[in-house]
Amino acid sequence: MSTNLKVTLGVLAIALAVLAGVVLVNRGGDSTPAAVAEAVVRPDSHRLSTAVDSKTTVVEFLDFECESCLAAYPSVEKLRAEYGDRITYVVRYFPIASHPNSYNAAHAAEAAARQGKFEAMYKKLFDTATVWGHQQQSQAAVFEGYAQELGLDMTRFKADVASTQVADRVKADASDGEALGVQGTPTFFINGEKFAGRPDYAGLKAAVDASLNS
């Protein structure tokens, strides 16, 4: 084999390897807009309101034991009260492992959701967060008390809290969050785009207004 032929074949082999690498990179990981939108809001995601025109969707990844989420909570509630069904508001779980009762709280909320009481438990957990938050011991009994106050079937609630189905549901939200680049809470998405402003009433309102007026 001549030297020129060897060089030509070598160049061709390198080109083919590069092309194969590009194809593999493009195939690895589905980052199409449709896939991103699906990861932001799933069919079973918890909606606190649903817009009549589906124009504006706000998604919050939260941890019930997160102090920043608690600080944002009044702004979120004010925003929801102001816009009502003009926006779709979605809550997704993103419990932080360093918070001792974040998973317990998320499981309690999901167990309540299975009896149609997600929003009531969501509000209860934030309204009382200074009572149960950042306690080193389990607050499961406290959450059971909230479930009783909400009139839930306690046998079913306790079974759901301990179930793999509820644990998997919470983990699924967290996995979506990680795939979307969520690193802390609260993290908001507006129409699939990560919100980069201040997570207060003024910042969220400006982003929502921009979406509604677009």
Tell where the protein language model's regions lie, with residue ranges.
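Short clusters of hydrophobic/aromatic residues that line enzyme substrate/ligand-binding pockets
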Residues: 47-50, 132, 195
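Generic structural signal for secondary-structure transition and capping sites
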Residues: 29-30, 117, 130, 166
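Structural alpha/beta surface segment adjacent to cysteine/selenocysteine redox centers
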Residues: 59-148, 214
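Extracytoplasmic thiol/disulfide redox context detector
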Residues: 1-97, 171-174, 210-214
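Extracellular/periplasmic catalytic domains that process cell-envelope and extracellular macromolecules
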Residues: 51-52, 81-82, 115, 180-183
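C-terminal cap of thioredoxin/glutaredoxin-like
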Residues: 1-27, 78, 145-214
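A structure-centric signal for secondary-structure junctions around beta-strands
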Residues: 55, 105, 184-185
